[in-house]
Regions:
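Conserved NTP-donor binding/palm subdomain of two-metal-ion nucleotidyltransferases/polymerases, i.e.
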Residues: 1-231
């Protein structure tokens, strides 16, 4: 990490997890840069609590419905699952959402003792999001000084957590445009401004962590944008 990145995470840890760290001294120019980076962090939209794949989304609904009627129901475990799923959805759309990761870390530390992690791991396996959930936990370990035993669903630290997280610091709303199509005078349809390429490249970053969700997210965006032409 460079100087600005180190100071940013020092501030995020101090503000959200009560560490006593202090940022290294900065010039006025660098303070403005940190302020912009914090704005970028806050500007990344939160993800919805839904799966991009229709079959998996129905499975998510069933998991929640069944748990509410279970004898040993665990609302805390359901809530943690919802945080993880929202982060997955947001990640595929906009990159790693540090606000969502911080929410995950805060919940683990304040309510983690109430969570049934055996049940949670069964659910994330059913939803095919084991590795991308592990990626979320790896961000907490890599940047927020969490211990691996605080996050039972992390069985090894994902190496990609470092690079993908630093990339998210430079989020720009203009980089997250949906795929755009235009109809030529001859009636053919084509994408504009390289939006197809940008969306595909963004999706490919997470393909190894959640293949079904990643491809479903890309195809949903593709057909949603195409339908706008027809309208």
């Amino acid at each position: 990490m460079n100087f600005l990145q180190r100071n940013l995470f020092t501030k995020l840890r101090a503000d959200n997890f009560g560490t006593k760290e202090e940022m290294e001294p900065m010039t006025t120019f660098k303070k403005k840069k940190i302020a912009q980076m914090l704005k970028n962090v806050n500007d990344v939209p939160a993800g919805e609590v839904k799966m991009n794949n229709g079959f998996l989304n129905r499975r998510l609904s069933k998991i929640q419905e069944d748990e509410h009627h279970a004898i040993d129901t665990s609302i805390e475990t359901i809530y943690l699952l919802r945080i993880i799923v929202a982060n997955v959805n947001g990640m595929l759309a906009n990159g790693i959402n540090l606000r969502g990761i911080i929410q995950l870390g805060d919940y683990l530390r304040t309510r983690g003792d109430k969570v049934d992690f055996v049940k949670l791991e069964k659910w994330i396996a059913k939803l095919r999001i084991q590795r991308i959930a592990q990626l979320e936990g790896s961000v907490l370990i890599t940047f927020f000084d969490f211990e691996q035993d605080e996050i039972p669903f992390v069985h090894h630290i994902e190496r990609g957590a470092y690079k993908l997280t630093l990339r998210s610091l430079y989020y720009n709303i203009m980089d997250q445009q949906a795929i755009q199509f235009e109809q030529t005078s001859s009636g053919f349809v084509r994408t504009t401004g390289g939006t197809m390429r940008k969306n595909l490249r963004r999706s490919m970053r997470y393909l190894q962590y959640a293949p079904i969700e990643t491809m479903s997210n890309f195809m949903n965006n593709f057909f949603r944008s195409l339908s706008e032409i027809e309208e």
